[in-house]
Protein backbone atom coordinates (compact mmCIF):
# COMPACT_ATOMS: atom_id res chain seq x y z
CA UNK A 1 0.00 0.00 0.00
CA UNK A 2 2.76 2.45 0.87
CA UNK A 3 4.33 1.69 -2.50
CA UNK A 4 1.19 2.77 -4.38
CA UNK A 5 0.94 5.92 -2.30
CA UNK A 6 4.58 6.68 -2.97
CA UNK A 7 4.06 6.24 -6.73
CA UNK A 8 1.08 8.60 -6.65
CA UNK A 9 3.06 11.24 -4.76
CA UNK A 10 5.92 10.91 -7.21
CA UNK A 11 3.58 11.17 -10.20
CA UNK A 12 1.95 14.30 -8.78
CA UNK A 13 5.35 15.73 -7.91
CA UNK A 14 6.49 15.20 -11.51
CA UNK A 15 3.49 17.10 -12.84
CA UNK A 16 4.16 20.01 -10.50
CA UNK A 17 7.88 19.94 -11.35
CA UNK A 18 7.14 19.95 -15.10
CA UNK A 19 4.69 22.85 -14.88
CA UNK A 20 7.06 24.93 -12.76
CA UNK A 21 10.20 24.23 -14.78
CA UNK A 22 8.52 24.79 -18.13
CA UNK A 23 5.90 27.48 -17.55
CA UNK A 24 7.81 29.55 -15.00
CA UNK A 25 11.11 29.48 -16.92
CA UNK A 26 10.30 30.14 -20.59
CA UNK A 27 13.06 29.99 -23.18
CA UNK A 28 13.44 33.07 -25.42
CA UNK A 29 11.23 32.83 -28.51
CA UNK A 30 9.33 29.82 -27.19
CA UNK A 31 5.57 29.72 -27.79
CA UNK A 32 2.91 28.80 -25.25
CA UNK A 33 2.02 25.82 -27.47
CA UNK A 34 5.61 24.59 -27.29
CA UNK A 35 5.59 24.75 -23.49
CA UNK A 36 2.34 22.78 -23.30
CA UNK A 37 3.81 20.13 -25.65
CA UNK A 38 6.83 19.85 -23.35
CA UNK A 39 4.63 19.29 -20.30
CA UNK A 40 2.74 16.56 -22.14
CA UNK A 41 5.98 15.00 -23.33
CA UNK A 42 7.32 14.95 -19.76
CA UNK A 43 4.32 12.90 -18.66
CA UNK A 44 4.72 10.45 -21.54
CA UNK A 45 8.45 10.07 -20.93
CA UNK A 46 7.87 9.50 -17.22
CA UNK A 47 5.31 6.76 -17.94
CA UNK A 48 7.82 5.16 -20.33
CA UNK A 49 10.51 5.41 -17.64
CA UNK A 50 8.25 3.71 -15.09
CA UNK A 51 7.55 0.93 -17.61
CA UNK A 52 11.32 0.47 -18.12
CA UNK A 53 11.10 1.43 -21.80
CA UNK A 54 14.09 3.07 -23.43
CA UNK A 55 13.53 6.75 -24.07
CA UNK A 56 14.49 6.76 -27.74
CA UNK A 57 13.06 8.85 -30.56
CA UNK A 58 11.61 5.75 -32.22
CA UNK A 59 9.85 4.60 -29.05
CA UNK A 60 8.40 8.06 -28.42
CA UNK A 61 7.22 8.30 -32.04
CA UNK A 62 5.57 4.87 -31.77
CA UNK A 63 3.74 5.81 -28.57
CA UNK A 64 2.69 9.36 -29.47
CA UNK A 65 2.14 9.16 -33.21
CA UNK A 66 4.00 12.46 -33.54
CA UNK A 67 6.30 13.14 -36.45
CA UNK A 68 10.03 12.65 -35.96
CA UNK A 69 10.55 16.40 -36.31
CA UNK A 70 7.87 17.15 -33.72
CA UNK A 71 9.39 14.74 -31.22
CA UNK A 72 12.91 16.06 -31.80
CA UNK A 73 11.78 19.68 -31.43
CA UNK A 74 10.03 18.98 -28.13
CA UNK A 75 12.69 16.72 -26.63
CA UNK A 76 15.54 19.06 -27.59
CA UNK A 77 13.90 21.81 -25.54
CA UNK A 78 13.74 19.46 -22.54
CA UNK A 79 17.45 18.69 -23.03
CA UNK A 80 18.20 22.41 -23.29
CA UNK A 81 16.36 22.98 -20.00
CA UNK A 82 18.49 20.29 -18.32
CA UNK A 83 15.49 18.06 -17.64
CA UNK A 84 16.74 15.31 -19.96
CA UNK A 85 20.23 14.16 -20.85
CA UNK A 86 21.08 12.69 -24.23
CA UNK A 87 23.44 9.85 -25.11
CA UNK A 88 24.10 7.99 -28.32
CA UNK A 89 23.47 4.28 -28.23
CA UNK A 90 23.05 1.50 -30.75
CA UNK A 91 19.86 1.33 -32.75
CA UNK A 92 17.62 -1.71 -32.46
CA UNK A 93 19.37 -3.39 -35.40
CA UNK A 94 22.78 -2.80 -33.84
CA UNK A 95 24.17 -1.13 -36.96
CA UNK A 96 23.79 2.57 -36.36
CA UNK A 97 23.39 5.00 -33.56
CA UNK A 98 20.21 5.99 -31.81
CA UNK A 99 19.61 9.01 -29.64
CA UNK A 100 18.66 7.89 -26.15
CA UNK A 101 17.42 10.12 -23.37
CA UNK A 102 17.06 9.88 -19.64
CA UNK A 103 15.87 12.15 -16.90
CA UNK A 104 18.68 14.17 -15.39
CA UNK A 105 19.55 13.56 -11.74
CA UNK A 106 18.11 16.99 -10.82
CA UNK A 107 14.62 15.77 -11.75
CA UNK A 108 14.72 12.84 -9.35
CA UNK A 109 16.35 14.99 -6.67
CA UNK A 110 13.45 17.44 -7.00
CA UNK A 111 10.91 14.61 -6.97
CA UNK A 112 12.56 12.97 -3.97
CA UNK A 113 12.29 16.17 -1.99
CA UNK A 114 8.69 16.69 -3.04
CA UNK A 115 7.64 13.13 -2.20
CA UNK A 116 9.40 13.27 1.16
CA UNK A 117 7.55 16.50 1.92
CA UNK A 118 4.26 15.06 0.66
CA UNK A 119 4.55 11.91 2.77
CA UNK A 120 5.16 13.82 5.99
Language-model features: where?
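General nucleic-acid-binding
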Residues: 1-12
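Short alpha-helical segments that sit at the start of domains
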Residues: 11-43
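Short, cationic-aromatic polyanion-contact patches
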Residues: 34-35, 56, 89-114
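Short helix-capping/hinge SLiMs at alpha-helix to coil transitions
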Residues: 47-52
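A short alpha-helical element within helix-turn-helix/winged-helix DNA-binding domains
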Residues: 53-65
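Short amphipathic alpha-helical interaction segments
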Residues: 65-80
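A short, conserved structural fragment
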Residues: 79-91
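Helix-turn-helix/homeodomain-like alpha-helical modules used for DNA recognition
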Residues: 114-120
Amino acid sequence: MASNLSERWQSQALSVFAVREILEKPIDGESAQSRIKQIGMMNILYLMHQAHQKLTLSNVIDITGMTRGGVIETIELLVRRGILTETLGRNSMGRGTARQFEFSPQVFAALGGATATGNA
